[in-house]
Curated annotation (Swiss-Prot):
EC number(s) reported in the record: 1.18.1.2
Protein name: Ferredoxin--NADP reductase 2
Species the sequence originates in: Cupriavidus taiwanensis (strain DSM 17343 / BCRC 17206 / CCUG 44338 / CIP 107171 / LMG 19424 / R1) (Ralstonia taiwanensis (strain LMG 19424))
Subunit structure as annotated in this protein's UniProt entry: Homodimer.
Cofactors demanded by this protein: FAD
Domain of life, per lineage: Bacteria
Gene3D superfamilies: FAD/NAD(P)-binding domain
Region annotated Disordered, chain positions: 1-21
Length: 369
């Protein structure tokens, strides 16, 4: 089971590392999408059908959002006409679908400034200094940027990235090592099961005997414990020991009042990811429980020209489904068109029959006898 995440930006898209063009002038664009998850990617597609080119910003360094950050190899069953696909496969297919529109990605950066200009457009600047003047903004940031929930033990953060890890990028790095894995969710169980037999030893720690993970994974973990392939302890990490700057032991306080000392090479902590709206919360948008209120005609916010699609928005009857986000992206694209083409009447066309859309998509129009 390889859960490492490659950078999946397709060849037909452009990725920009940051900074504005030569001369320091902002990029003047029609549409800026904040969030490169499935809904943000489909927003590129829907805008592309209307001949609107998009730039995409994401705080992660890879495209895919929650799908590749949380469940790249887990099956998704509720995408229409796709009986089953993984989060990574869904992302790859969406990237393939948007290739004709050649979006530009600005990864590893967050929007830090949004200002309305006198001409109705928006000035936007990112944390890396990339600047835009855009006619429309689409917020497709899921539930915000994700940060791992960290282990609250004084001083242990000094080992972060050396012997303390909150994500696994290269599983082989832990082969032959003595591991302690902490957590009670799917990520903790998945990595425990994957690394047993590859690591020198595995001890799993959770604060209680109940789990928030798939029952089959829990059963398999307990079976491995019975076979003496690994150990499981109920308790919480309360301290550690180091020697010459190297983490050598952790202290685990159990419910029985006993503190145990565990030698280790690496500590893997999976307490989940904490979603944060970040700077979006300061844009002057109407919020309800950290979600952006929108209308259901165009999924526009209280600020004309700014739209919100996917899990980050809220409206009566809202369901947090990828399917719902795709629907919202389609209507948001049509809602944005008048800001970009104020003199142009937008006609409804269908990809099955429209020669114009076939040209936009780079496909041949079918000829029927």
């Amino acid at each position: 089971m390889d859960l490492s995440i490659p950078n999946p930006v397709a060849d037909a898209t452009r990725q920009v590392e940051g900074g504005s063009p030569a001369g320091g002038q902002p990029l003047e664009i029609d549409a800026l999408i904040v969030g490169a998850g499935p809904v943000g990617l489909f927003q590129v597609f829907e805008l592309g059908l209307l001949e609107i080119k998009a730039h995409v910003i994401d705080s992660l360094k890879v495209v895919g959002g929650q799908c590749v950050e949380l469940y790249p190899d887990k099956p998704i069953y509720d995408i229409p006409a796709v009986p089953s696909c993984t989060g990574q496969e869904l992302t790859d297919n969406l990237l393939k679908q948007i290739e004709p529109f050649e979006p530009t990605f600005h990864l590893g950066q967050e929007v830090s400034v949004v200002e309305r200009r006198d001409d109705g457009r928006f000035f936007v600047e990112t944390s890396l200094g990339t600047r835009f003047i855009t006619k429309t903004i689409f917020i497709a940031a899921g539930v915000g940027s994700f940060q791992p929930r960290t282990l609250k033990v004084d001083g242990i953060d000094k080992f972060d990235g050396k012997q303390l890890f909150y994500r696994v990028k290269d599983p082989s790095r832990f082969h032959g090592r003595n591991l302690v894995i902490v957590g009670g969710g799917d990520s903790a169980l998945d990595w425990t099961l994957d690394l047993v037999g590859k690591a020198e030893s595995v001890v799993m720690i959770h604060r209680r005997d109940g789990f928030r993970a798939a029952p089959a994974s829990v059963a398999k973990m307990k079976e491995l414990c019975e076979q003496m392939e690994m150990q499981f302890l109920v308790g919480q990490i309360s301290g550690y020991e180091e020697k010459d700057g190297v983490l050598t032991e952790i202290k685990v306080s159990g419910a029985d009042g006993v503190t145990r000392r565990l030698p280790l090479d690496d500590l893997l902590v999976f307490f989940g990811l904490s979603p944060k709206l970040g700077p979006i919360a300061e844009w002057g948008l109407d919020l309800e429980r950290k979600q952006i209120k929108v209308d259901t005609e165009k999924f526009q916010t209280n600020i004309p020209g700014i739209f919100a699609v996917g899990d980050i928005n809220t409206y009566p009857g809202k369901k947090k489904l990828i399917l719902s986000g795709f629907h919202e992206a389609a209507l948001a694209a049509f809602g944005a068109a008048p800001y970009i083409f104020p003199e142009k009447k937008i006609h409804m066309q269908y990809t099955t029959t429209s020669p114009k859309l076939h040209k936009v998509l780079g496909v041949e129009s079918p000829v029927f006898d």
